[in-house]
């Protein structure tokens, strides 16, 4: 996965405290090591995390290591990006999307 100090790791254990209780817009990229489209999306997620640092919290969650949260939010395919604001899922993108789509979706919720 593409590395960025602005991409945080979400787990079933920290999801509630870190993502749902975030005072900022939080986006979470559900992915898996074996997922080709997830690997293609990773650099885009890292770029967006860097561009919106301080305004948006960006997380990645490995669905194989953390099955509870994806099930709770009905994530059926990966990659899936969910957008959370004030503790609620407000938007989602399924599949590999261009950077412009992620940026416009983020801007819609800021």
Where are these regions (language model features)?
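Conserved residues in the N-terminal Rossmann fold of short-chain dehydrogenase/reductase
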Residues: 60
